[in-house]
Curated annotation (Swiss-Prot):
Alphabetical list of SUPFAM superfamilies matching this protein: FAT domain of focal adhesion kinase, PH domain-like, Protein kinase-like (PK-like), Second domain of FERM, Ubiquitin-like
SMART domains associated with the record: B41, TyrKc
Protein name: Inactive tyrosine-protein kinase kin-32
Coiled-coil residues: 662-691
Consequence of gene disruption: RNAi-mediated knockdown causes no obvious phenotype.
Organism the protein comes from: Caenorhabditis elegans
Organism domain of life: Eukaryota
GO CC terms: cytoskeleton; focal adhesion; plasma membrane
Amino acid sequence: MEGLARVFLIGGASKAVRYDEQTTIERVIHVVARGIGISQVAVAHFALRLVTGPSPQTAGSGDSLWLHPMLRITQLPHIYARHLPIGVCDEIKLEMRMRFMPQSVYELQATDSSAFVYLHEQVVDEFFSHVAWRSSVEVALEVAALKVCRDFAEHQHNKGADHHLEDLDIEACIQSLIPNVLHNPGFKHSHLKKTFTAYIKKFSATSPNESIIRSLALLLEVVKFDVELFKASLGAGWTKPVELVVGPHTGLSYRLNERCDSSRLLELRTIAEITIRKMENGSEKTLMQLNLSGAAKPVLITLSTEELSQSLAHLLDGYQMLYNQRDSVFKLKGIERCETLTMHEATIRPKTPNNIDSNIRLRRELITLKELIGGGQFGNVYKAVYHDLEKDERIAVAVKVCKTDAEPADTQLILQESSLMRNFRHSNIIQLIGVCVDQPMWLVLELAPKGELREYLQQEKDWLPLRILTLFCSQICDSLVYLHSTRFVHRDIAARNILVCSPQCVKLADFGLSRALDYDAVYTASRGKLPIKWLAPESVNYRQFSMASDVWMFGVCMWEIFSLGVKPWAGVTNSDVIMHIEQGSRPPCPEKCPTALYNFIRSKMWAIEPHKRPTVDQIYAIIEDVRQQIIQNIPPEQIIVGKPMTAAGVIVAEMSSLPGLTLYRTMEDQKRQAEEDAKWLEQEDDEDEDDQDIDQIPSTSHSSVENIRTSNGYLHHTPTSTRSLRFEDKTSRGLRRSVDGVCDAVTKLQNSFNNLTHNDDFLHSVKEVTSQLREMLIVASGMRDRVTTTTQRTDVDMTKTLIANDMKQMSRVMGKLQVNGHQATYNTLRRDVVRICGELAVNCTTLQLQLTQPPLENEFSSLLSNC
């Protein structure tokens, strides 16, 4: 999204600034300041406030809407919607003012004359707009005369015209600058004109700099431009009303009223963190908390409205940034705050899993903790800075600090989490950077600047579109596809354990409860607290966890996302949740969730029986299909959710678990079938000389199996059995060959790929896959008429949709590869391509079976007769 923002300057001039989705208020200030000749040194004194009317003069209450420097321009219409009148032009209007005053205006004159002149014009404008009518007539006339002389001299210099001050219309000058003075009953009109004329003659020879200094000296006592006043109450609650005074000389002080002396509350440079929150539901009052460097307790201040709180917080934050030369400490909802140093997100290449001591162990002295950002069962989480000596750069990271009094079992869980995370490589899973193994143990993780997803949803709920919510679901599901393909279950999938790295990227985190699955595909927990309201029934009742229980939890997580951060089962106790579930109750459909998608979550993902739930790769295909429909602007009520497809493969059974008689009968049937197939092959070879390659296809009992890796494990792609070949014609055999070609190309890509694979070789392998896929689709397009039943047609259409989604996804990833130069991200994207190719092979095999499915009535009859 791009647009133009109109920035008004003092005196009525304005600048148009082009912005995009990443343009911040801070960036606009820098651009405008540079455009009017203000140096980088003085930029920190300036701020922007939102103009809520056609111009600053008609803005009304907009003077209190000061904008956080890290706020994005595109967020303004959403955050301040109730302040912007309906029907106003879409162009965003801002006003730039100097808000953070210097210790000495004369020092500012020496360092940046342009900023000094801007401050003077601002103070004079404030005087004529709001103060002149209640000040002494002599001061008003003198300030007005100084301004007229300066403006006249500037006009003479710019135009080169030969005019004289005596030619000025004195009454018009007074009327334009201080009209209220004309109606002062204490002065006669003729006396006003005479006094004003005398001042003009007196200052006619004064230089512009001297004129500005004299004006500021006069106005300092009248306008009080170096302080701001706020009505507030110290502490929590409106119990001790005072007047707060904020300025470079007063710091943050308070006084009972205007006649009392002020008492200093704190120094502005000591402010370490600013947060504001509503006092209670239904109340306009807000509570501000100021955490101070070196202070044991925070300072609490109650203000009457949220706008007033944000204005005070903005002022205090601006002064501490000016004095400490660091970035914002004001925690405003929805704002990404910067760090002191120039840092970027920690998307550095994870260490190799070999030799944990040397490869992921970090020196504690290279890590500087900055601020507490969260806590959990095993310890607190801090924002920190890690000094990477190899690259000689400082990186913003998150540090999980284990409690010093933690039980050995809890310490073991944290060690296990680090052991798990060092092996995970996925673009939507938080990366482990390293571990400080000495007590207290530290886990150093990739930093997600925007925090937990649940809080982010609550903060940004007014602007988050359905497209973004579905994207979040898709990214989380993609990470689960990867996790399950490595035979791990997460066991704690919830919005609180999803972290937001950017407005369009979320990552799965908190692997403290993750477990590797054994061959039973079920893990039984023996201890620890469990998140009851997110758990599947079998997890609550029997403490059993599997990929199917992860699917249930992901369904609850999706519900949280579409509910914009609402907790599930609100008002229901943990002990009653399982009773509600077993009685058929489920959380209601969120307002933002498409009905068809909610029905899929309710009926499939929240099925009581674990085996009836879809796999995460099937869910991923469904979500991607829904997301594409949303991108195509299909209304939510018209969105369709297809039937989840199951990849066709070999039925795998544990031979030792079969009864002896059944095992013997199975072996005999396979032997007899192999003999019949061999005879039939010989006959077919004689009858059809055009298909010489059929006799090379092995029987079912001797076929070699090609393993194609998919996101859900392996697809055992076996060459088509001779039983199926009985029903093949030339077209069917052509489709089989083309599908085999796709599978062979994918297998070759998977077997040859690693992080060191040359890019040309990788691209050649991918082109081979797409070439074979194109051939297969050409053959398949001519076979749809063979499908006779509606159900079969629906299945074929769904599989084609899955293939199309895979191709779109691969196209997007390949596009990212062309513009991405970071090695770690580059290899992650290439692995994504390999994974998508595996999914393509699965779906192509499924399509082949659907288009060439032989009649099954006779086989069913034979099977039933053997029962």
